[in-house]
Amino acid sequence: MNIAHRPVLLAEAVTALVGGPLIQNQNSENHILVIDGTFGRGGHTQALLKELNPSAHMISFDKDLDAIAVAQKINDPRLKIVHDSFAQMDQYAEAESVDGILLDLGISSPQVDEAHRGFSFRREGPLDMRMNTDHGLTAAEWLEQASLEEITHVIKTYGEERFAFQIARAIVAKREDGLPPKTTTQLASLVSSVVRTREAGQDPATRTFQALRIFINRELEDLELGLKAAMKLLKPGARLAVISFHSLEDRIVKQFMQAHAKVDVPRGLPVREKDLPQSALKIISRLKPSDAEVSENPRARSAIMRVAEKRIGAAS
């Protein structure tokens, strides 16, 4: 099934990176290198390629083999496709060699809409949830072996679900009866039988599915590693743009950027402001989708993009 995917904050992300001092002043003698951390269906990658000169290069990462198959159809010698997590990007580029990095942390519409991927509680399919279907346990396999405490922890921590214990207890009870959830709709029905209250506009299974997806794919661990790798790879003057879709991701991005945008000076030390060392990052902007974009693409409504620039002359 060919399901269209609309990249979120497309124009804003391109402007954020291309508007940085390095790419803005690109010429044929500059060796411009840009990284797109998640190819998805190529919207951001292809839009950025249009803004780069013929001698530029781009590396796009994705853990999803379906995304890699789409990416390999792009006939552009400037583009290198890597089947790996952006958390490993520092294995594919030299330190301080990259002019711009984009991390779009959302899952793509095909991943949600294709039932066999197991991401959607609205579509009957195997309870898989893996981005990389060649690696790791499926959500169903993990739920069959995890303890009550482990399931509770995952749903509470990554889904911020207040009924985490009750949901975990129901899963374990079904498992003990020889009926562990194997499909998306089985799990969604089980959660709905426990979570009696509904948040406005949200299915009772939303938080549980989010939690399992984040855990199975190590999304927050990858984000933390990816941010550290980005700091290592960015040239002074290069920009980092990160699009997040829920509070757990955005909190990590916000705290990371803020931590690198300040200078720790011992309290009481008599140092004039002009003599303070520079911070590693300068925070550029925080953007949300316009009302028009959300109207056209409701999945964009929770997106937040944070942009920062590595200071010239500052250490990582």
UniProtKB/Swiss-Prot annotation:
This enzyme's EC code(s): 2.1.1.199
Function noted in UniProt: Specifically methylates the N4 position of cytidine in position 1402 (C1402) of 16S rRNA.
Gene Ontology molecular function terms on file: rRNA (cytosine-N4-)-methyltransferase activity
Any GO BP annotation: rRNA base methylation
Keyword tRNA processing found: no
Residues bound to S-adenosyl-L-methionine: 42-44, 62, 86, 104, 111
SUPFAM superfamilies registered for this protein in UniProt: Putative methyltransferase TM0872, insert domain (SSF81799), S-adenosyl-L-methionine-dependent methyltransferases (SSF53335)
Top EC class of this enzyme: transferase
Domain of life: Bacteria
Methyltransferase is among the record's keywords: yes
Lineage of source species: Bacteria, Pseudomonadati, Pseudomonadota, Betaproteobacteria, Burkholderiales
GO cellular component: cytoplasm
Record's protein name: Ribosomal RNA small subunit methyltransferase H
Reactions accelerated catalytically: cytidine(1402) in 16S rRNA + S-adenosyl-L-methionine = N(4)-methylcytidine(1402) in 16S rRNA + S-adenosyl-L-homocysteine + H(+)
The family this protein is said to belong to: Belongs to the methyltransferase superfamily. RsmH family.
Localization of this protein: Cytoplasm
UniProt keyword annotations, A-Z: Cytoplasm, Methyltransferase, rRNA processing, S-adenosyl-L-methionine, Transferase
Pfam families (alphabetical): Methyltransf_5 (PF01795)
